[in-house]
């Protein structure tokens, strides 16, 4: 994930990362600490205070979903090139690109060089976002012409198992207030946190993921996030 720095930050410890307001940081790990993320900037990495940045969620980033789930979701898409990026199951901290082509789903390991740049083949990029944009017009495969295109929203199925109401494209909301869980299965968060919604079939309680945790939360505690931010 990427984040925009809201303020200047000067590191006060060897494991912290300095940055300036407006810098685009690569967030490497959101689960290290409640108040600190691990991030990278200009080939250097370190810890940054979470309240100094604003996350930039992308509709194609699905986080920690299994390879099998990615194949199931993309298998329902009509068009070749429908894709998502997910965190690698076999190599924590790395990413995989899953793309629909024909009746199959192909998986590409997103590689990184010593300077922290991302690439699939030869051309390298400073961010996943740049890599995705490039491969919208340049094939991700050397064997077929496969151009990335955003997945389509699959209409929700009313009734039946709640699992059928999972969103097929990630929708993000931002917390307006702090929410502390009162029951098992509820999702706690702090004001300003970004939440990925995975089920919005209930008018009052939605299911989402935040900082590696999944659970239910009250709809009136959040506000939609612009997909194009």
UniProtKB/Swiss-Prot annotation:
It comes from the Eukaryota. Keywords: Cytoplasm, Developmental protein, Endosome, Golgi apparatus, Meiosis, Nucleus, Repeat, SH2 domain, SH3 domain. It is found in: Nucleus; Cytoplasm; Endosome; Golgi apparatus. GO terms for molecular function: epidermal growth factor receptor binding; insulin receptor substrate binding. Residues 1-58, 168-227 form the SH3 domain. GO terms for biological process: insulin receptor signaling pathway; meiotic cell cycle. One of its GO terms (cellular component) is Golgi apparatus. Adapter protein that provides a critical link between cell surface growth factor receptors and the Ras signaling pathway. Promotes meiotic reinitiation during oocyte maturation. This is Growth factor receptor-bound protein 2.
